Structures are given as C-alpha cells and as structure tokens.
C-alpha cells in the first residue's frame, strides 16, 4: 500500500485529482490473497476508486486456463500471476465520465466499446511500453490506440512510461504528442461530444455479416464449379 500512500499524498498536496497505475491485493475466499494490475483514481479528500485490469497479457500476467486446469498453476515463465478483474469501472471527473484501459487492453476493441456504452465520455490509457525497448512495438501500440478513438468517436488520453504519449482526437489526429523516451509534461483540453459511432452501437456485426456473405458466396461458387 506504499504506492497508494504516496499517490494520495500527492493528490492532497496539489489539490488535484490523480489517476495512476498501481499493483493491488485483496484477501479473497479462504483467506487467499489475489493480486491485481490496477489503476487508482484519487481525489484531494483522500477518496479512491479502483479499476482492476480485466484482460491480462497471456504468459506475462497470467497463465491461460489455469483456473480450469490446476496443473497449469505450477508452470513458471516468470509471469506475474495476477487475477483478472471483472468490473468495468467508470470514473467521474467533475461530472464527466471516463474509463481507463491498462496497457494491452487498448488492443481489444470490445473493451473500449463496452466502456463507451456504459457512459464513458472519453478514455485514458496507462501503459508500460518499456518491455518493447526501442522497437516497432512502441509505435504499433500507439497506432492501435488511434483505432479505438476512431472506432468509437471518442478522445483518448494516452500516457506511456517510455512514450509515446499524447491526446488522440476522435478523428485520429494527435495533439501534444510526446515522442519515445522523452520526459515531458503536457496539458491538453479534451473535447467532449456525446456522439455514438456505428461501431459503438453495433459492434462487429457488420464484419460478421460480410464474412458470412463471403462464405456463402464461396460455397455456392464451389457447388456451381462441381456441377
């Protein structure tokens, strides 16, 4: 809880609301301790609200299917063995709702869509990209965040410990971009628009229908060729 204390003190001293990443642990059933990759939203009055990462990185943060096959828990690849969260938490900033994606979650479209449908007006992303080094992964991860902004027509504020950071507008344009491996503080005004995109409302149905039409067309083409 030392991270919690430091972050809470910073929020209290500067009288600002603060969003930060932190590990957390909770005693669960049978006194078992569950560890989480979390984000914490603090207010100057000392109150906090937590979001626990729902989709963990396979083999880095957890072993897939280990809850169903106990022998998998004995495998050790140096993973963190976090417990996946289950609640899509919405934060409130002076009457404006927002949600936070943790690292790898920004690569999964349905998570961002779920948050927007729950009322989030914008999205933040906290990410540790240091594991990529100075590779193409850093830039690819940032470009993926642009897709989430355009898909849902919402602004995204992205903060990476080694960069790339910046404010991504609903059009995909980036404001106040901080390059890789550059220490900098930037202030951005986040435009709030309550416009629901086609993808936010209908999800992947368009892609599913197109796929089905393609498969049906191929099937009848194959039948015609055989006859």
Where are these regions (language model features)?
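Short beta-strands and strand-loop turn motifs
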Residues: 1, 21, 125-128
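Catalytic-core segment of enzymes that process non-peptidic bonds
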Residues: 11-97, 152-183
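A short, polar/proline- and glycine-enriched secondary-structure boundary/capping micro-motif
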Residues: 30-31, 59-63, 109-113, 135, ...
